[in-house]
Curated annotation (Swiss-Prot):
All ranges on the Cytoplasmic side of the membrane: 1-11, 64-69, 163-168
Protein name: Disulfide bond formation protein B
BP term (GO), one: protein folding
Main location: membrane
Gene this protein is translated from: dsbB
Taxonomic superkingdom: Bacteria
Protein's cellular compartments: Cell inner membrane
Membrane-protein topology: Multi-pass membrane protein
Alphabetic keyword roster: Cell inner membrane, Cell membrane, Chaperone, Disulfide bond, Electron transport, Membrane, Oxidoreductase, Redox-active center, Transmembrane, Transmembrane helix, Transport
Coiled coil: none
Disulfide links within the chain: 38-41, 101-129
Similarity comment: Belongs to the DsbB family.
Length: 168
């Protein structure tokens, strides 16, 4: 007997694993490569956390159609939000003159959140959003983040729309 939720559960586990890997790499860049996160980076980290934890909850809960769609819808909203933030940061990297110097209201707000006090290494913003110190294949970190958010959004929409009686 085939479990109709198995493909969906595999995707949810892959989404969680991908988000955990991206967060782990962000911490590596911060702690080993000394690349401080800016306010927009911290918001993207929060989005990756929200997507990953929602996927993990969906994986363990294995809900029926309505619950699966709620989990997938939340993941899609978090992915689109994170993607928009990543695109905004990519724009700031390309047009740094549009960025104001000094402490931004976003930085002050994020650093005042309980999350930043509870886990400052993960959620405290100290970097400059327009600073480019890392590139891979001619793409900056915000570019790659936007790509990963698009992939996560596409997977979330697939989970949202897939029929549960689909067989492997």
């Amino acid at each position: 007997m085939s479990n109709p939720m198995r493909p969906v559960r595999s995707i949810l586990l892959a989404i969680f694993t991908g988000c955990a890997g991206l967060i782990g790499y962000a911490l590596y860049l911060q702690l080993v490569e000394n690349l401080l996160p800016c306010p927009l980076c911290v918001v993207q980290r929060m989005a990756y956390w929200l997507i990953g934890l929602t996927a993990l909850a969906g994986f363990f809960h294995t809900p029926e159609t309505t619950g699966r769609r709620i989990y997938a819808g939340l993941m899609a909203v978090f992915a689109f939000t994170g993607g928009l933030v990543a695109l905004r940061q990519a724009w700031l990297v390309r047009y740094p003159e549009a960025f104001e110097c000094g402490i931004s209201p976003e930085e002050a707000f994020l650093n005042a959140l309980p999350l930043a006090r509870w886990w400052p290494v993960m959620f405290e913003a100290n970097g400059d959003c327009a600073d480019v110190t890392w590139k891979f294949a001619s793409l900056t970190l915000p570019d790659w983040s936007a790509i990963f958010f698009m992939i996560l959004a596409a997977l979330s929409i697939y989970v949202l729309l897939v029929r549960e009686n689909q067989r492997e």
